[in-house]
Amino acid sequence: MSRLPVIVGFGGYNAAGRSSFHHGFRRMVIESMDPQARQETLAGLAVMMKLVKAEGGRYLAEDGTPLSPEDIERRYAERIFASTLVRRIEPQYLDPDAVHWHKVLELSPAEGQALTFKASPKQLPEPLPANWSIAPAEDGEVLVSIHERCEFKVDSYRALTVKSAGQLPTGFEPGELYNSRFHPRGLQMSVVAATDAIRSTGIDWKTIVDNVQPDEIAVFSGSIMSQLDDNGFGGLMQSRLKGHRVSAKQLPLGFNSMPTDFINAYVLGSVGMTGSITGACATFLYNLQKGIDVITSGQARVVIVGNSEAPILPECIEGYSAMGALATEEGLRLIEGRDDVDFRRASRPFGENCGFTLAESSQYVVLMDDELALRLGADIHGAVTDVFINADGFKKSISAPGPGNYLTVAKAVASAVQIVGLDTVRHASFVHAHGSSTPANRVTESEILDRVASAFGIDGWPVTAVKAYVGHSLATASADQLISALGTFKYGILPGIKTIDKVADDVHQQRLSISNRDMRQDKPLEVCFINSKGFGGNNASGVVLSPRIAEKMLRKRHGQAAFAAYVEKREQTRAAARAYDQRALQGDLEIIYNFGQDLIDEHAIEVSAEQVTVPGFSQPLVYKKDARFSDMLD
């Protein structure tokens, strides 16, 4: 009997805002929300973006005037809409019309003369080029003479062809929320996102730790691009060329595994299992598969799974743009048939499109096994039962889509059929497509989904694509999809792909239902298939069950009496979670960052033949019995 991995918390930040309590989802379907939910989310965004202040439970304008949620919507809604989701790259990241560049300049002295200039001796190159000579000058400087042609690199600026990205809400800076000095942006985001996920559970972290053994907590996270800004690998690689020194922090903080390490070391204080599995754009699902495996096998009882990616940098944009992968200004101009480009519609899954849109995002989910969730009264937002991963076989282009995704989608649907039945899959499931917004993706992914739907007798299969709203966050992309799916389970709304006028003519949709308007479901949706396709042949498809199905499974396994006791205990959890949400809406995000605190005294660790006792943990680590190979031994 396998343990069921249930989602008991989720949180993070992307272009839609804070993910916990479905606020990011609400932003994406803001037109379809009731006034109270809409105004609550807008007020929270206004505080995040520093448009209004929150003091003593009241919202205040810059001049101190009290504001009601209705006032905030009336006064700031349009500004919030313009400063969230995919949009033109903002100057705090870079100026897409004037990105710093080096231009090669060749200089030649006039015939019979030399090029001369003064400089400090400390500034001269070592060794001195053969065609340079120096002579003493006043004030301790030297006169440099260059006698032949030479090459210089001079500061210059030029425009990027790509000018849109999925950026965190304008004014929200994760590094301002804790002592983040020297931390790359991706690590800043991982700290605040993991905090949001932990706080969203409504259960004190120490309570969780006290109920499991020290090694029964696991964290699986990371990034695919590593940390490429000046505080990470970007600064490391550029330092010598810029004449700067490499710092002692840039190399270790640049690791792609460092989001995982920061969560263990500064947020959780965990000594449990840890890992960073990468699979291009399917990376989150790779880590989710590991989380599912360690819970179903009993190796862990609590797992934090997520990713953090901060790729809005000139180098990343140039790299993906050189591949022809990104939506360019000119490409969007040709699609729209006008000179004035709407960058908010740059990401167009399954419509007329010209490339994907890079985005930053950090998202985390908290998983528990079903027994622990019941014991602690955890609020269950869904369950994750399987992730299937397959490669593409032999390839020509390493970045082109391939056949592996047929295998993953088909296996995911077959798996769900065995759990919930064919009728539920046919009439109460939906797909969160990879939907990258490239011409190749819209054809190949839609054909895969259409053919699998045909094989299982599915008609009108609802398909959505969250990248239309928040862009493509690379490692974190399928986490954006999963958390959006939880919003659909909660509100019964499937986000429409509102950045397209219509589905492109070459999209296969005989058995699919793809809409550019939000779709409110008459009957509850019970199963979501998360699909992801990554460069290199990294294909993954996950199965997510609704909280209704998860609770039905728990009731059957543990009995009505145990479930009734759980429901009673859950009310306290929900109250604590709601209290955190209200504080967060007021700007109190309660970031967990324990630098150098509660360090474990290694000399106080007690090791015996039966167990290990670790200071600071209420339960010992008891060695598990291993009978895996007992049939092979005498």
UniProtKB/Swiss-Prot annotation:
Secretion signal span: none
InterPro entries given in the database record: Beta-ketoacyl_synthase (IPR000794), FAS_alpha_su_C (IPR047224), Ketoacyl_synth_C (IPR014031), Ketoacyl_synth_N (IPR014030), PKS_Beta-ketoAc_synthase_dom (IPR020841), Thiolase-like (IPR016039)
Protein name stated in the entry: Beta-ketoacyl-[acyl-carrier-protein] synthase FabY
Any GO BP annotation: lipid A biosynthetic process
Gene name of the record: fabY
Sequence similarity: Belongs to the thiolase-like superfamily. Beta-ketoacyl-ACP synthases family.
Reaction catalyzed: malonyl-[ACP] + acetyl-CoA + H(+) = 3-oxobutanoyl-[ACP] + CO2 + CoA
Lineage, highest ranks first: Bacteria, Pseudomonadati, Pseudomonadota, Gammaproteobacteria, Pseudomonadales
Disruption phenotype: Cells lacking this gene show an attenuated growth due to a defect in de novo fatty acid biosynthesis. Siderophore secretion and quorum-sensing signaling, particularly in the rhl and Pseudomonas quinolone signal (PQS) systems, is significantly muted in the absence of fabY. In vitro, the deletion of fabY results in an increased susceptibility to a number of antibiotics, including vancomycin and cephalosporins. The antibiotic susceptibility is influenced by changes in membrane lipid composition which lack a single secondary lauroyl group, resulting in hypoacylated lipid A.
Positions of the Ketosynthase family 3 (KS3) domain: 78-546
A GO cellular component annotation in the UniProt record: membrane
Broad class of enzyme this protein falls into: transferase
Domain of life: Bacteria
